[in-house]
Curated annotation (Swiss-Prot):
The keyword Manganese does not apply. It holds the Pfam family GRAM. Its EC number is 2.4.1.-, 2.4.1.173. Residues 237-288, 719-785 form the GRAM domain. The gene is atg26. This is Sterol 3-beta-glucosyltransferase. It catalyses: a sterol + UDP-alpha-D-glucose = a sterol 3-beta-D-glucoside + UDP + H(+); ergosterol + UDP-alpha-D-glucose = ergosteryl 3-beta-D-glucoside + UDP + H(+). Belongs to the glycosyltransferase 28 family. Residues 18-28, 156-175, 459-479, 487-497 have a biased composition (Polar residues). One of its GO terms (biological process) is protein transport. Sterol glycosyltransferase responsible for the glycosylation of ergosterol to form ergosterol-glucoside. It is found in: Cytoplasm; Preautophagosomal structure membrane. Residues 1-16, 35-44, 82-108, 585-595, 846-862 have a biased composition (Basic and acidic residues). It comes from Aspergillus terreus (strain NIH 2624 / FGSC A1156).
Amino acid sequence: MRPLLDEAKRRVDRRLSASRQSLSTSRIFPSALPERLKDDHDAQVDYTAPPGGGGTKEGHFQYMQQSIFGMIAAVGSQSDFHARFDDSSDSERDTDRPPQKRTEKESQATDAPPSSKNEKKALRSPQRPKSPSQERGRRHRKTLSGSRILRPLMPGSSQRQGGAQTEPSTGNQMSRVPSPERPRSTTPRAAPVLSRMVEAQALFDSKGSMNQSPRSPPAETQEEQSQEQTSASPLSLRLMEMFGFESPEKVLVEYACSLVQSMLLQGYMYVTEGHICFYAYLPRKSTVAIKSGYLYKRGRKNPKYNRYWFSLKGDVLSYYADPSNLYFPSGHIDLRYGISASLSEPKEKDREARDFQVTTDQRTYYFRADSSTSAKEWVKSLQKVIFRTHNDGDSVKISFPIESIIDIEESPMVDFAETFKIRAIESGETYAIDEYYFSFFNDGQDAFNFVKGLVSESQAKNPSRESPQPGRTTPQSRARGSRARWSLTSGLSQVLGSSDARRRRSASASQFSPGRDAAGLSPTSRQRDLSESFVNSFDQATESSTVLQSMTDTAESASQILNRSDVFQYPAMQPFRRQSLSEDQFGRRHSDETARSTNDIARLGPGITPRDVQRFYPPSDSDHDAQDAARVQQSASSLNELVRAGAYPLQRAAGLAEYLRNRSKQMGTLLASESMGYIEKVSGMWAGGRRHYGEAEGILPDDQDVDPEDKEDGCNHGDRFRAHFALPPTEKLQATYFAYLHRVLPLYGKIYVSQKKLCFRSLLPGTRTKMILPLKDVENVEKEKGFRFGYHGLVVIIRGHEELFFEFNAADVRDDCAVTIHQHLESVRFLSESGMLAEQEQDESEAAKAEHRMLQEARKDASGGLIPQTPSDESPEIHPIFDDPRASIINFKPTESLRITCLTIGSRGDVQPYIALCKGLLAEGHRPKIATHAEFEPWIRKHGIDFAPVEGDPAELMRICVENGMFTYSFLKEASMKFRGWIDDLLSSAWRSCQDSDLLIESPSAMAGIHIAEALRIPYFRAFTMPWTRTRAYPHAFAVPEHKMGGAYNYITYVMFDNVFWKAIAGQVNRWRQSELGLKATNLDKMQPNKVPFLYNYSPSVVVPPLDYPDWIRITGYWFLSEASDWTPPADLMAFIQRARDDGKKLVYIGFGSIVVSDPSALTRTVVESVQKADVRCILSKGWSDRLGDPASVKSEIPLPPEIFQIQAAPHDWLFSQIDAAAHHGGAGTTGASLRAGVPTIVKPFFGDQFFFGTRVEDLGVGICLKRLNVSLFSRALWEATHSERMIVKARNLGQQIRSEDGVATAIQAIYRDLEYAKTLARQRSIVSSTPFSPTPSAKTVAEQEVDDDVTDSEEWTFIGDETDIDISRRVRGRAVSDVDMLPEPLAVRSPELAQ
C-alpha cells in the first residue's frame, strides 16, 4: 500500500502522474484495498431490514424519522441506490487500463530528445522575425506526456532575465501560450478558400525576409547611452525602458490623473523634457458575468427581432433562448474582434434610442433594449469589454513628443474633476491629429498651466513646426524615434513597449496611427481599409461560417462539409497589385503554410493595409524600395476605389476568370482532393471513436485509427475547437469523443474535453446545438446503462442543473471519456483550491505587477518617499464615464419591531433551526415566537424566545408506523381512523397560536400557515430543510430514484407530490377555512404556493441553487445553533479520544438515531464487527435499542469491545470536531453538522429526505451513501472514509465553505428584501377569498380604499413567472373585481393592521 501524502502538491502529483492508476468512475480508492475488506458472504444482507417483512424487493424500507410527511409521501419515496461495491467494480477498473498504457507512452515520448520538427515555437519578438524553419516548425510540435496537467504547477517553469523571456525547455515545461488571436486557417471569419489562396500571394515575397535579424546599434552609441543612464534618476531610466526612449529624459513633474476614452483609465501622467507620458496599470480580465439581461436581436437575414437572454462574460457576448439553461447558448459574439458598440439613431427624433449595434470585423449585429437606459448601459459595458480585448494586457502606455503638440485647452466634462484636451500631430507620413483628454481630481489647474507653458516654449523654439515636411522612417527608426505612441501592452512585451510582441491587435504607433476611435484605428485609415475589405471579399460571413479544414478531419458537420467547396462560394475580386508571384511559389496548395501566412494578416485585426503588412513582414532585398512601394499602394488604392464604384457583377466574373486562367491546374487538384475529403469526413464522423491530443494539440501517436495526414495537421484541431465555441487561446484541447446527447431526442455530435471546459457540438444537418460546460460546475460523472439497447450511458452531474446524459456506441469509449473527465475534474479543483492561474496568465500578471511595482519604487525614490496617489490605486475595474461609482444600497430593514411567529411541527431536528433564526431576530430587535409541540417549550424558553403550543404529537404517528409498517393495509386502516382527528387538532391549535403576528414563517409540514396568513392578511414565508420548490435540478426529497432520471422526472415529482398531498388534506382544510377562518374554499391554483417566498436552511455549497429557481427562493445556509459552550464532555470520553490518538487509530462516530429495526442485536453486532474489521475506534450513539417496536423482540445486548465507546448524547458541533469520519442516517441537521466539521460522511438513509442528502453527499465526493448495511459494505466504507485522501480533502474544503457562511444573517436579509412582495401576495389572496365572516382590519374604509391598489399590486407581482401562473392570476384578479362589493365588515380586532 502506497503511503498517504498530506501535502496538496504531492497529492496532485500522485493523482496526475503518468504511472497513476486510472480513475474509477464511481469512487476512487487512494491505494489497494486490504484483503480483509473484500466482499464476504453477507454482502447482500441488510441488517436494517424493517419489522414485519414490509420491505421492498431490494430489502429497502423507509421509516418515519423526523418529518410528518412520511405518512403521506412515503409511498413515493421508495427508492434504491447502487451498491457502492458490487461485482462490476473489477470490470470497471479493467476498462480503465488503456488510458494508463497511453500515458506510459506519452511519458516515454516526453523523455526522448526532441527532433527538429518537434521543437516548440519560440515567442515572437518585434526585433527578431521568425525564420522559415521556425515557421514550419509550427505544424510539428512535441506531444505532451501524461502529466501535462501538472506542468503549470512545477516551479521554475519560466525564467525572466534582463526583462526578456527565456525559451522554455522542451521536456519539462509547457510551451508559451499565445495571446488571444485569430485561429490560423480555421477562423470562421476567414475568406473563402479560393479567395484566401489568391490573397496569400501578397505574403510569399515578404516571408523570405522573416529570418533577418535586427541591426544592433554601433558601439559608440551604446557607450553614450550607458554614460547617460549612469547619471539619470531611477524614474527616468524606468520610463526610458517602458516607453522606448533613445536616452533617459529628466522627469519634470508627475500627476495622478485619468485618461478619458469611452471609460476612465486611472493612472499617472509623467512630463519629461521631451515627452508627455501616461501609464495605467489594468487588472486581469474578469471571469464573471459583467452584465446579463433580456435583449432583442435582429436576425441575420430576417429583419424581425427575437428576444433572448444575453450574458456578457469575459470576451464573449452569448445569448440564450432559455435563461435557466445557460450551458446551451443559441449563439455568441466574439468581442476579441469587436470594433465598436454604439447607439443607433432613433427613427423619431423626439424618442430616445433603444436600439444599438455592435460592429465586428466581419459583421454588424443589431439589438434592441427594453428602455433607453438599458441600451446605454449595454453599450457602455460592451465598449469596456472591447477596450479590454484590444488591450489584452495589464497596462496602458501613451507617449507623444511635446514638440508634436498643437494646442491644449480646457474641456470641462464632469463636475467633480478638471479636464483638458491635448491635440497632437502624429510624426510620420499621415500627420493625423490626435486628441487626448485627461481628467484630474486634484491639481488639475496646475497641470494645465505647466503643460501649456511647455507647449508655448516648444512652439517658440520651433516656429516652422506647424508646416512639417513629409518624411519616411523605417519601422525601427520610428520605434526608437520621437513619435506619438498609444501602446496597450502586457508585461511580457516590456523592453521597448513595442508593437505586437505576439501579434496582438493593440499595437504601438510603429504600426498604427494613435488617433483611434473605439476600433482603435484612425478614421481615415479605417475608411481606406474597409473599402479595400469591401473589394476583397463578398463572402456571406456567419457566426459559425466555413473554415479551412484538414482533408480528413472528422469534426465537420454535414452542412459545413458542403460549405467547404469553393464552387458554392462567391469568388473574391483580387486587388490590383504591381507584382505577381511565381508559379512554383504558389504551387503548394495543400501546405498549411499558405493558409497560415494568409491568416497572419487577418490575425492583426481589421483594417490592416499593405503598408502595415510590410511593417509586420520586413521587405527582402529583392523587393521594391519604399518609395516605389508607396506609389504602388497609392495606385492600388485609387483603382480599388474605381472598382468599388464600378459594376458590381463584373467583380465576380473577373475574379473567377483570373483564377481559372492562372490556376487551372490547382483548381482541378483542389476539387478532386476535396471531393474525396467529403467522403472520408462523413464516414469518419459516423464511425465515432475517440482522440487524445498532446500539449501542442496534435493527436497522440498511440491513438488508434489515426490517419498519418491527420497527425501532421493535428495542430489545427485546437484552433477549430476554440473557433467553434469562442474560447481563448489558453483553452487547450485534450480529447474528443463522438456520442449522443439525450435531451428530448438523442442528438449525435462531438464531445470536446479541454483543460477547463466540457463542450458538445451537434453534427446533424439542420441542428445548431452547442454546449459549453465549465468543469468547475461538474460535480461528478457516473456510468449508467444506455437508454437504447446496445448503447452505453454516461451521466454528468452538474451543480444546480439537471443531469446530462450521453450515449456511446462502445463501452471502452464511454469509460475512457469518464476517466478523462475525472482526471480533469481533479486538476481543475486543485487549481481552484490552490489559487493557481494558468502559466501564461500568471506570468503576464506577475510581469505587469512587477513593472508597476518598479515604477512605484522609482517614483518614490524621485519624490523622496512622497508620491501622489490615484483615487483608487490598482482599481479593480475600468470606470464608465458619468456613471455613479457605486449604486446606493437600499436598507430593507423595517423601521418598527415586528411580531414574528415561526410555525413548525416534527422532531427536535425540525425545531432547532428556528431557535437559531429567532435568536438572530431577537438581536435585530424583533419579537419572535415559536409555535410547536409542548414538549419543546422548556428548550425554547431557555433561549429567551416566546412559545405557543401546537397540538398533534408526532410520536403518535411514529407509533402507527412502528406497529403496522409503512403503508401496509393495517397502517392505512388505522391512519384513516386516527389521522383525521390529528389534523383537525393541528389546524385549530395553529390558528390560535399565530394570533397577534405581523409576519408568519412556516415549515410546509405544518400545513396551516398559508391559510392563517391569508386570514390575518399578514406576510407569509416558508422555510424548510429539504427541497420543496419545483426544479429540474433535483428530485423531490421523498421521490429520489434509484438511478438518475433527468430533469423531466425531477420536475414531475414535485407536481405529483403537491397534488397528492393536497388531495389528502383538502377536505379538512377547506372545512376549517370556512368554519374558523371565515374564508372561501380554495385549491392549489388559487393558493399559488410556488409564488410564496421560500427560505431553505441548508448550505448553497451542499445543495447548489438551481438555475431555474425564481428570485424569491433563497438558499441561505445552515441555521446552526451552537450549544457546545454549555456542555462539558465526560472525562471517560475524553480519555477514549486521547487513547485513540495515542494509538494512531482513526476515530469515527456512528449513530443512526431512534430507528426501528427488526433485529437490534444483529445491527449492533454488524456495527461492532465492521469497526473491528476496519481497524478504527468508534464513538457509538445506539438509539435503535432504546425504542423497539415489538417488546417481544428484546434480546440480550451484545457487549461492546474496548474499540467502541457508547454515549447517550453530545452536541454535534463539539463531537464532530473530534473525529475523522461520521456515519449516520442522513437527516438534514445531522448531515449539515458533519459536513460543517469537514469530515467524510457515511449515510445509511432510512426515510424521506435522508435519501436526498445521502445522494448529495455522494455526488459531492465527500462521503458514501450505503444501499445496504452489512459487515462487508460498512467496514469497507469506514476504511475508505478514513483513508481516502481525495475524500478527506474534499470534505475539509466543503467544511471551510460551510463555516464561512452565516445562514441566519442571510435569511434575515432575505426576509427584509422580500417582505413587501409577501405583503402584496397576502393582500391579493385575502381580497379574493374573503367572506362576511373573515377577520379583517378594523376599518371598512381602509379595506375599500386599498382595493384598487391591491388589484394593481397583484398585476405587478404575478407577472413574474410562467404563463400558467399568469393565466391563473388573471382569473384571480377577475374574481377580485367582482367581489369588491362583498368585502366584509370586520369581525375581529385581534389581527394587526397592515403596514401602509
